[in-house]
């Protein structure tokens, strides 16, 4: 069992109070934070880095690469941090008028979506707003990029594809009967998967808009999707506390981890040998299929966090 320590906290000076304790116990499968009422004594506090530029409300999403970390917040802004310069803020992105719910970026662009029903495309190098995409009629809950194409999904039941250079809506996928929480491109950009409050997962042909597969997937809102294009598998996580693995080609359920979390599953990701999930419990669970069956790592945190309009928050970065 591995224990993992928090090395750095970025935020306002008050982000860690004097009563906040961080406990780390070797050999025990927990890692958690506690309030002042607990009598345990922490071995050490993580380093706190505070800058004049910081978020004034909950951070709802983040992404990072080797150079920058970008965060989106309920304060309607994003902050870009320089990872190689002690995580100093480079700039703040301001244009949304409500909470930033998701973001994505590549070497040229940063794309953000918001409860204000819009998507913003920013120049990564300068922070300039290049264009604002409008077309959804509900909160835009998720965005992802593949080349010069953006996929978005919304509480308006729709998935949309956009050209990042022109801002034009290329295609629209209709069929879901309730609001959507997540959408994903396949690695080659040929397929799009979407899911949400109607408890189903749909797989679409990105070029034609045809719904290829519809899976009656879960007993509650499907909060998270992740496509592993190498294996052709799709991982879903739901408010029903289950994580499931699907065959993309056939729509067949391959694996089911019932009641994997004690509460809502907020995010589930995978690579060639692991599934990593976060929940409202609050836990991070790591299933390593390359190790012994009992080798499950669990990291526990503070109390459950609730995001806008009933959707709990969860970072999208995957370590």
Which residues does each predicted region cover?
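Conserved strand-to-loop turn within each blade of WD40 beta-propeller repeats
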Residues: 72-75, 113-116, 153-156, 177-181, ...
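WD40-repeat beta-propellers
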Residues: 11, 78-82, 103, 119-123, ...
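WD40/WD-repeat beta-propeller blade N-cap
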Residues: 52-59, 94-100, 134-140, 174-180, ...
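WD40/WD-repeat beta-propeller blade-loop signature
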Residues: 55-58, 89, 96-99, 129, ...
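Conserved beta-strand position repeated across blades of beta-propeller domains
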Residues: 61-63, 104, 144, 184, ...
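A structural motif specific to WD40 beta-propellers
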Residues: 46-49, 88-91, 128-131, 168-171, ...
């Amino acid at each position: 069992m591995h224990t993992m320590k928090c090395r750095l906290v970025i935020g306002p000076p008050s982000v860690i109070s004097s009563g906040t304790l961080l406990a780390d116990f070797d050999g025990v499968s927990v890692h958690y934070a506690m309030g002042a009422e607990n009598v345990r004594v922490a071995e050490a506090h993580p380093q706190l880095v505070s800058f004049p530029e910081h978020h004034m409300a909950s951070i709802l999403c983040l992404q990072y690469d080797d150079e920058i970390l970008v965060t989106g917040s309920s304060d309607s802004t994003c902050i870009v941090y320089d990872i190689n310069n002690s995580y100093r803020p480079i700039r703040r992105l301001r244009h949304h008028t409500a909470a930033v719910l998701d973001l994505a970026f590549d070497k040229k662009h940063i794309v953000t979506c918001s409860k204000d029903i819009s998507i913003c495309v920013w120049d990564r190098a300068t922070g300039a707003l290049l264009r604002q995409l409008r077309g959804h009629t509900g909160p835009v809950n998720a965005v992802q990029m593949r080349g010069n194409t953006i996929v978005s999904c919304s509480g308006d039941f729709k998935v949309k594809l956009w050209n990042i250079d022109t801002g034009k809506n290329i295609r629209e996928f209709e069929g879901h009967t309730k609001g959507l929480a997540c959408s994903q491109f396949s690695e080659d950009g040929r397929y799009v998967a979407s899911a949400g409050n109607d408890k189903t997962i749909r797989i679409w042909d990105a070029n034609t808009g045809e719904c290829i597969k519809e899976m009656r997937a879960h007993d509650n809102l499907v909060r998270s999707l992740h496509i592993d294009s190498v294996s052709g598998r799709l991982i879903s996580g739901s408010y029903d506390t289950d994580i499931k693995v699907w065959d993309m080609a056939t729509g067949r359920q391959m694996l089911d981890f019932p009641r994997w979390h004690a509460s809502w599953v907020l995010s589930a990701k995978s690579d060639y040998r692991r599934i990593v999930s976060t929940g409202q419990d609050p836990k991070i669970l790591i299933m390593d299929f390359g190790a012994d069956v009992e080798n499950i790592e669990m990291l526990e945190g503070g109390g459950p966090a609730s995001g806008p309009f009933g959707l709990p928050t969860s970072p999208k970065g995957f370590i």
